A protein has these predicted regions:
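Active-site proximal loop and beta-alpha junction motif in alpha/beta enzyme cores
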Residues: 1-203
């Protein structure tokens, strides 16, 4: 718009619900969750079923702690295998709940991953997994917009392009739209005498 990029849309891999209506016992509490794939396997958890409170900067440390415990327990207890790829574990836990900004977002999340980290964005693969879950539950149709908000207020727009199959699973093709800002410019040089100027391969 007026010579400026206002958004970038990508079409993601097939997303699908792997297992639904699961529970895991964490510190004596049974927590319901769903395993869905959106590029990685996610455990999706409804925060209204928990007693931590709304998703915001103050509660994120508690969600991180719970998410790490859940991820470890789920991978110990649930056999996971992508139907066509060599992916065999839940990598991320996605907590979702009401947004305090319903005028510009549908729902809010915090995605826990890695070494006790929280995604500052709504997570593209996580948004894809959420779209697949909502579609499976009959809560969103093809072409309908879903605006996912992170705990710091950044948003992604998700739309289901079409339905498909992945192995024996009903799946959807998600389209994710987001924005970014230019923060710097770099210059890379090739020295003709550099023996590794074109890189190298291992294995």
């Amino acid at each position: 718009k007026n010579g400026k990029v206002t958004g970038v849309t990508l079409t993601n891999v097939p997303a699908f619900v792997y297992k639904d209506n699961l529970t895991v016992n964490v510190d004596g509490k049974e927590i319901p969750y769903t395993i869905s794939f959106g590029g990685s396997f996610f455990a999706l958890v409804d925060t209204t079923k928990l007693d931590i409170g709304p998703i915001d900067a103050k509660t994120v440390p508690e969600y991180i702690s719970l998410g790490m415990k859940m991820r470890d327990l789920i991978n110990e207890q649930v056999e996971i295998q992508h139907p066509t790829l060599d992916i065999t574990e839940v990598d991320l836990v996605e907590f979702y709940g009401p947004t305090p900004n319903p005028d510009h977002a549908t729902m809010r999340n915090v995605v826990v991953f890695g070494d006790a980290q929280a995604d500052r964005s709504p997570c593209g693969t996580g948004t894809s997994a959420k779209l697949a879950t909502l579609h499976k539950w009959g809560e969103i149709g093809i072409g309908e917009e879903f605006i996912y908000e992170s705990f710091i207020g950044t948003t992604f727009k998700g739309v289901i392009k079409e339905e498909t199959k992945i192995g024996d699973y009903d799946a959807v093709i998600p389209m994710i739209t987001g924005t970014a800002n230019l923060t710097g410019v770099g210059t890379y040089l090739i020295d003709p005498e550099d023996k590794l100027k074109y890189g190298f391969l291992i294995g």
